[in-house]
From Swiss-Prot:
Naturally occurring in which organism (per UniProt): Shewanella woodyi (strain ATCC 51908 / MS32)
Lineage: superkingdom: Bacteria
Alphabetically ordered keywords of this record: ATP synthesis, Cell inner membrane, Cell membrane, CF(1), Hydrogen ion transport, Ion transport, Membrane, Transport
Protein name: ATP synthase epsilon chain
Family classification: Belongs to the ATPase epsilon chain family.
MF term (GO), any: proton-transporting ATP synthase activity, rotational mechanism
Amino acid sequence: MAAMTVQLDIVSAENSIFSGLVAHLQVTGSEGDLGVMPGHAPLLTNIKPGMARIVKQDGKEEVFYLSGGILEVQPSSVSVLADVVKRADEIDEKAAEEAKRRAESAMADAGADFNYAAAANELAQAVAQLRVVDTIKKNIAR
């Protein structure tokens, strides 16, 4: 018996990153982790910066970094629309660590005209990228 699948499209502002049949998608929604499988109820929600983990039709896993965006679930398709999408192997770990350090430093030395929301967003994106890198390292070590 063939595995149940749903059509998934992951697109960024620049291009389509993934299009294919998947058995499972996991993203970080606005209310926490969200798993989507074939037959999921229709849904439209914000997604936070974090990891998107997919299990493809053949059972292989693929991991992406999403800067945040929108998740739309329809009966026969799922769409992820994000400003920035990176495959796990495209993430520059050193740059993400530096961005995290800069954001933490800026938040610690905040002045009166400091944009806390922008710094918190930069920190969340850097931490999310580092989590994706860490997940990949753990999977390789298995």
